[in-house]
């Protein structure tokens, strides 16, 4: 029998263990009983904006990583998975993609993916925190690939709900907004009202015929408060739209299976069986993650996950 102290090192020994492996560490509280420690090479940038603490750090395993209010948001190593899953299924499902609205996404990565589609004529990105946009435009242009300078793009520094009060409609609406609760159960009052039935219903009212709404809808670990918050978001979206489908993929930097939910008001085969191969080939798109094969896998959930709802 192995002595317990050989399996579970006492916390008193933790500082020594960390110092011998990496000089700097980032601690992220995933829940009340689960903490993630990431080794950091360097803190590249830090600014307290009007809305949040913005930090950019070079992680030993994740590369350059965006941290907002102590939570990892975008990591160089796997952001392409998250953004491919958020953007490209919606672009395939929509009947037309001429006009696209992005809510949040101040890092410019979702915008970068939308602009890969030649049929996109106009994109409006609505971001409440101007410092987010300026940070990525100036410090990390290789992430955005010049997306903010594209002539098809209009940037609005505003609350996401403001544009929904205007007399405009869209073929695709993408929500890259931070979910209202983190894994520990703490509430984010800034985004809480952006995940209500009223808000999602307002989005549905701004979609053109056979338009598609895509939203990042949090993560799943099959334990703890993270799952409960995800289920609440999914049920709220389902209450506002006639048809919904949820995609699932593990994101290493989030330590969870992450989800994107797609919704529309018309029951069309384009959302249940979209022409992925044809759409990608016609537009000359060879994406890093999203393919016809990965599309099928994204929408194939294990029974234990389906039973959450």
Model-derived regions: residue spans:
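Conserved S-adenosyl-L-methionine
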Residues: 216, 241-252
């Amino acid at each position: 029998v192995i002595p317990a102290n050989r399996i579970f090192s006492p916390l008193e020994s933790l500082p020594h263990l960390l110092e011998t492996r990496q000089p700097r560490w980032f601690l992220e509280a995933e829940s009340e009983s689960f903490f993630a420690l990431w080794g950091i090479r360097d803190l590249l940038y830090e600014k307290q904006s009007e809305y949040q603490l913005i930090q950019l750090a070079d992680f030993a395993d994740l590369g350059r990583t965006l941290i907002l209010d102590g939570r990892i948001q975008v990591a160089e190593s796997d952001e392409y998975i998250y953004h491919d899953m958020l953007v490209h299924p919606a672009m395939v499902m929509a009947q037309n993609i001429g006009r696209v609205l992005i809510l949040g996404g101040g890092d410019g990565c979702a915008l970068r993916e939308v602009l890969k589609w030649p049929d996109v004529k106009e994109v409006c990105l609505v971001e409440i925190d101007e410092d987010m946009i300026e940070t990525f435009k100036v410090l990390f242009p290789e992430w955005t690939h010049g997306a903010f300078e594209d002539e098809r793009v209009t940037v609005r520094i505003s609350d996401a709900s403001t544009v929904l009060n205007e007399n405009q409609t869209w073929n695709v609406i993408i929500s890259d907004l931070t979910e209202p609760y983190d894994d520990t159960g703490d509430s984010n009052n800034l985004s809480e009202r952006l995940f209500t039935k009223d808000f999602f219903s307002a989005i549905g009212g701004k979609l053109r015929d056979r338009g598609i709404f895509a939203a990042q809808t949090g993560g799943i670990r099959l334990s703890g408060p993270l799952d409960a918050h995800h289920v609440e978001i999914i049920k709220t979206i389902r209450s506002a739209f006639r048809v919904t489908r949820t995609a699932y993929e593990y994101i290493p930097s989030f330590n969870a299976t992450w989800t994107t939910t797609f919704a529309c008001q018309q029951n069309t085969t384009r959302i249940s069986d979209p022409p992925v191969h044809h759409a990608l080939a016609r537009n000359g798109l060879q994406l890093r993650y999203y393919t016809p094969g990965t599309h099928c896998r994204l929408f194939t959930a294990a029974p234990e996950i389906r039973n959450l709802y």
